[in-house]
Amino acid sequence: MQKFGSLLFPAALKEKSAGKKIAFIALFTAFSAVTNMFLEVKLFDLQFSLTVFVSVFTGVFLGPVFGFCACFLGDLVGYFVNSWGQLYFFWVGLSTGLTAFISGVVTAFKTEKKGAIYAKIAIICVLHLFVCTIAVNSTGFYLYNKAMGFSKPLLDYVAERFGGNADFFAYLCYRLFFKGQIINSAFNYALLFDAVPLLSLN
């Protein structure tokens, strides 16, 4: 029961009153929404932003459950306020929420080992890449593009490098490497290694 409580509310929030907990959740939801509205550039299935960094920070501070809720709602609110004229893709919000959830779970386990925080950050980055970027976001956009019809640049890229078969692996390579989504992820990961140790989460 105590372990569950630490997952629900991390040490920074556990002793706060219910009112302060609600205020912090609302604050991080607004922070996530502002990030989605003003600190990102969306180009259909690509997104260049600080969303990963903000979502990790939110999950660390609020814990996995409320971190997920704050980031998912923040993404939804951000879309309604500033949609960039695009459709709402629910898997983007799901991915954002999962980033916070993963971060909250990983950092909930305390250890006194030297350098443990760097190991935690590395685990968060790897899980984000495979769970959020690949399994959720890229899969969602691949299925959407497949249903709506792949773009000519994508088909040309696939034809040149994979012989014309636009399967998931080919689309993933196109999205991550040709269009540069991996650069955005790497930039956010670098920020995490730079900034998160300041939170003293060992």
Predicted regions and their residues:
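Loop-helix junctions at membrane interfaces
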Residues: 1-202
